[in-house]
Amino acid sequence: MKWKDWVHVTKLDPDKQLGPGDIDAIAASGTDALMLSGTLNVTKENLLALQKMIAQYDLPLVMEPAGPEAVLMEGIEYVFVPSVLNTTDVQWIVGKHRSWVQQQDGKIPWDMVVPEAYIVLNPASSVGRVTKAVCDLKPAEVAAYTEVADRYFHFPIVYIEYSGTYGAPAVVKAAAEAIDHAILYYGGGINSAEKAAEMGKYADTIVVGNAVYDQGASVLKATVDAVQ
């Protein structure tokens, strides 16, 4: 299955702890892919430790780097690289990307790289604070960012990120109506089948992360079943 066909992705944070039984249950949940992603305290060491825990399972593995200093590429199917469109700091749009390219010095396997246009909408989240995102956006403004990402910059993914809180379905609906070519991702606060189904009406792909750590793999499976 290609990444464009995924409907459910599980986001795993290298700064959080999972037991072997948790990994078994996540792998058996029916999720389409596993994403290694975090905002704080992400290092190559804890990324490698998490990768080792999940390497035995036959699931696509995505690296979503928080910055150029910790990016895995070996044993990874795709590297999803975010650009935060609604930030006041150009580092999060293109600056860190330039640093990564310079550091790699021609070694980036570009056929693995999938650019993401992030629209971050939770000001209390780590990603919102770190990236200095302007989060108080109306649905029409989110739709406009989505159209810019899709039609002007040609990002293959537009990612509506509420990170830790459940977002407004009207906002995701507005983004869905504005999009033409890109795949629409939604992440944030999905911890039940009902929420998964609601956001799954508008987003092509839902991402579940915190619920895995807070409520366990049974909730994860319920979110998978709601969209598949």
Curated annotation (Swiss-Prot):
Alphabetized Gene3D superfamilies for the sequence: FMN-linked oxidoreductases
Keyword entries, A-Z: Cytoplasm, Lipid biosynthesis, Lipid metabolism, Magnesium, Metal-binding, Phospholipid biosynthesis, Phospholipid metabolism, Transferase
Pathway linked to the protein: Membrane lipid metabolism; glycerophospholipid metabolism
Listed cofactors: Mg(2+)
Annotated positions binding Mg(2+): 13, 39
InterPro entries reported in the protein's UniProt record: GGGP/HepGP_synthase_I, GGGP/HepGP_synthase_sf, GGGP_HepGP_synthase, GGGP_synthase_archaea
Pfam family, one: PcrB
Subcellular location: Cytoplasm
Catalytic activity: sn-glycerol 1-phosphate + (2E,6E,10E)-geranylgeranyl diphosphate = sn-3-O-(geranylgeranyl)glycerol 1-phosphate + diphosphate
Regions annotated as coiled coil: none
Domain of life where this protein originates: Archaea
Function: Prenyltransferase that catalyzes the transfer of the geranylgeranyl moiety of geranylgeranyl diphosphate (GGPP) to the C3 hydroxyl of sn-glycerol-1-phosphate (G1P). This reaction is the first ether-bond-formation step in the biosynthesis of archaeal membrane lipids.
Protein name (database record): Geranylgeranylglyceryl phosphate synthase
